[in-house]
Each structure stands twice: as C-alpha cells, then as structure tokens.
C-alpha cells in the first residue's frame, strides 16, 4: 500500500502519495502524458497507414539525399586530385585508376563480409519476396548497413565503373519498410499480417524509385511492372501517397541546400514546344524503337551468357569463391584504364559524370551540323555550359565518338554486372539508350539539314528528342516495362514527345518480350530463385494440362484413428512442414491441416492423466489442445495448369492439397508447378 502524506491542493479530500509528491514535476508529467494520449488517439483515428507511409517517404528521401551529398563530395575530391597531380602521365593514370579500384574493392569486401546477400541490385529477390516466398536474410538490418556503405562506395567511382542506384535503393526502401512495420506492430499490439506486409513492401518499392529520380508517377508504375505479376488497385493510393511524400521531400532538400531555386525536373531540356517534331518523323521514332528492341535482345543474351561463363570458368569462379575484393579490383582496374581520358577515354566522353552524360545527350542542338565546317578543339577541362564538346574530338567525328561510346559501354557494362557488390543497372541502360537515340537523331539531322518538309512548315530535327525516345525505349526493352516513357517525361519535365516516345517504347517491347526474358527475370533464373515463370495460357495450351498430370501423389496423411506410435514414425521419417489431417485411414476424407511444430510439441508434452500402457491415438492429441487449421482452399485433379498458376500467383501460396470428392489424393507445391510450366514451354525431345 502506498504511504499517504497529505491532501491535494484544492481537493475535497483525495490524498497524495509519496511517490507523486517527490516525483519531478508531477503536474507537467501528467499534462504531457494526457497530451500524448490525445495526440495518439487523433492520429490513429485517421489511420496508422498514413503516418507509416509519410515516415517511410521522408526517411528514404533523407537517406537518398545524404548519400548523394556524400558521393558528390568524394567524386569532387577525385576530380581535384586528378587535376592537381600535374602533367605526368604516370601520376595522372594512378590518380585516375587507384581511386575506383580502392573504392570498388572496399565496396565488395565490406558488403560481402557483413552480409553475403547485399550484392547486386536486389530487385530479383524483391520480386520473389512479393510473390510470397520468404527470404528473411534479404530484409535483415545488417544487410541494410552493408548495402548503404557498399552502394555509396560504388557510386563514388563515378562514370568510370558506370553503375547506378535504382535497384539497391529500392531494396533499401523495402528493408526500412519491413523494419518500420515490425515497430508499428509492436507499438499498437498488432499481430503480423502477411498480406498487409506485402502491401507495404509494394508501396516501399515505389518510394525507392521516386526518391532516386523525384518521379512519383513513374516510380509507382515502374515498381508495379517490375515487381508484381498481379497488383491490387487498393494499393494504388499507398504507393502514390508514399512516393509523392518521398519525391517532394527529396526535391525540397535540394532547394534548402541552395542547389536550385524551386522544385523542378532533374534534367532540364529546351525542346521546341510549338512544333517539336514533324509527322513523318513518327516513322523514324518507331524505327528507333525496333532498333532498341533488337539491341536489347543482344544485350540480354550477352549478359546472361557472360555471367554463366564467369561462374563456370575455372579461374574466375575460384577467384570469386576465395577473394571477391580481388576480382572487383581487377575489373575496376580494367574499366578505369580504358576510360583514362588521355588514352581511349577521350573518344567516349569519359570525363563526364553520368548525370552530365544525360544533360549533354538531351541537348536539342545538332552537333553534327554545328561541327560541319569546323572542328572545335578538345577542351582541357569540361565546360559545364558546353558539355557537348566532350563528344567532339579532332580525330573523331560526332558519329565516331557516339558509336565508339556505345560499343565500349555495351561490353564494359556487362563486365561490371559480374562484380559482387551493391549496384544498380537501370541508369547505365538508360544512358546507353539515350546515346542510341542521339546517334540516329544526328544522322537524320545530317540527312535532312533543313528538316523534313511537311506542308509549308520546315522545322529542324532535334536529336535530343530522339535521345529521349531511345533512353525510354532501350531501358524499357531491357526491363520489359512501359513506364520508362513516363519516367523520361518526369526526368526532363517535357511531354511534347509523348506520342513518339511511347510508340518507340511499345515497338522495343514488342521485340524484346517475344525474344528474351527481362534483365530481372534472367537474374532470377541465373540465381535459381523460387519464382514461378509467367505463362500465356491460351498461346501455349495450358488449359488442357490439369493438376492430375503433375501433382505429387506420394502424400503422407495422418488419420484421427492413427496410433501415436505410427504418428511418431511419420514425424521422424518425414521433413514436411504440415500434414493433411483425414477422418479415417479408410476414407481419407480431408478435414484439416496440422503443423509439424505443433504436433511435435504435443507429442513431447503428453498429459500426466494418461494411464501407462493404454494405446492412444492422434485424436487424443487433438482433443488435448493440439491446434489444427481448416482447409480453406484446395485443388481438384481437373483444375487446369493455368488456373492453378493464377491461384498461386494472386494468393501468394506455397502449396495446396488436391482432393477428389473430399478424398486427399495428392499435393501441388511450387516445385511441381514450376516443373510443369517448364515442361510445357520447353517440351522434351521425343525418344
């Protein structure tokens, strides 16, 4: 009992406790507590999802901007070092190469030592997790720290290594979302909800894209196209709300840091608005889409083939298994040596950063026409107001530098994707596509120097518009997405080329999707992740194939009248996570599901009231409190492969039991379903 020491001031008789009297500022504490309880009540009346999404967007914007700020300082220090070492070729070469070699080897070594799951972009693993597969290690907090440090070091190498930020940052956003979800569940006392978690992870994927490009609309659509096979419209508002908060905060930080006067697009363009293109140019935009589609197929095929070669080659596989930092340093040395500006790098604009590459390629002036009569000298240092001069070397024409840039970056990017470190691969593909479009645009500007005559109006061709279409088409073809067109508009703030850019993206996807799997699907296949392949039911005849053709008939059931000795034998001889519970051994009528963990626990804690020597059955264990689950969904042997595939994808299922007239006859898991789809798509050769 508390010791009472007096009455409250102004009270009619309610006593004051000793703890309350001597506590520090009891009235203030009570007021603060009441205020916090009132605020909590009002906030949760609105809905906790809103606060969760706002916190996620703001937090990811802060992380993205902080990373960009730190990376910018490191890149600036590298340029200063390269500029100040003098004219000696050896010192300049060492200052150019040692920097990325050290950063890349540290990125690979640090990230792999902290978490071996931090390498790559992380998007294939996220796509697998959003389909219902549990990959806990990829959402671990250690993985977050390794990914942040490793990605920062990778991006600090600049355009020398030529890698991006999108994929790993989406992975970081999903990890933050999972962590905040656990905190929220503990705060409000909510049990874990798998469906709710997947909804929040989908919104987090949109936030990751939006806080990299400050593009909320394309961020949501790109995350849907890349991550989801089926998407609920109910999740739309979550994705757009969180992405808008993140993009707004990201651009607002740039204004606060005096980087810009107001919130604008990242890559500003000066395209002609009144007549941006003539009607006959639509044909060339569509042709550009077909070219990007063909080149994307070549890139995807070469990338998968080279990755397979690196993994199977005796020397490279041994080096990757024993010393990943050494492999990263070796690849970085090769790439840095090629991009050394006084060497081959002078012919591929190697002194420009990746952002400056896009700024220059989106220039609306024709470089070929500007250098037709005279070749400007190659500047000693890049001019921020005339970045296009980096593409004009006295020994090469504009077409030569653009073509050389494409050829070199094509295989250099494939080589860089084999390094085991956190890195994104979307931005390099986007820039390569812009160079493809720029090359075609410059060729058309030379072929039609006065523009294509359409009626009485004559308008010069803008190669920057073709660069914009090429960037969207090539990146869309590699990733099998259409939203890259909208991303190009949000990045540049221009929508005057909306129709030709969209037509180019559609043409590129028409070729790529029919010839090659996307970059992320190819990575899923290379890593052998548990992901169901996509099927076209009506085209490959998945309806005639039924469950009875591929189900697992070796089903271990537990009947209620099974003696406990046999139950123990079944549990110890099998390793399945759950058993189908049937009524009797004769009828095999499916009545429920019993988890292995619950069954083992019940067997180990037999009631003391049981008489020794008396035979007991499974139904006695169940009556004693062993929990069972009802069978809410099951397959029929006549269910088609297409229907089973749709159920597994939309409901994120792992396995289902097959019943015929209530009798358990088999089961279907991911393994059987994936094998059936593979056999249907690639039938075995006749014997």
Swiss-Prot record:
* Places the protein is found: Basolateral cell membrane
UniProt membrane topology term: Multi-pass membrane protein
Looking at the record's lineage, which domain of life comes first? Eukaryota
Q: How is its activity regulated?
A: Activated by extracellular Ca(2+) and inhibited by extracellular acidic pH.
Q: Output a single Gene Ontology CC term carried by this record.
A: basolateral plasma membrane
Q: Tell me what turns on expression of this protein.
A: Regulated in parallel with BSND under furosemide treatment. Decreased to half in the inner medulla under furosemide treatment. In the renal cortex and outer medulla levels were weak and did not change. Regulation with BSND in inner medulla is limited to the thin limb; levels in collecting ducts were not affected by furosemide treatment. During furosemide treatment selective down-regulation with BSND in thin limb plays a role in maintaining salt and water homeostasis.
Q: Could you list which ranges are Cytoplasmic topological domains?
A: 507-687
Q: Where does Ca(2+) bind?
A: 259, 261, 278, 281
Entry keyword set: Calcium, CBS domain, Cell membrane, Chloride, Chloride channel, Ion channel, Ion transport, Membrane, Metal-binding, Repeat, Transmembrane, Transmembrane helix, Transport
Tell me what this protein is called: Chloride channel protein ClC-Ka
Encoding gene (name): Clcnka
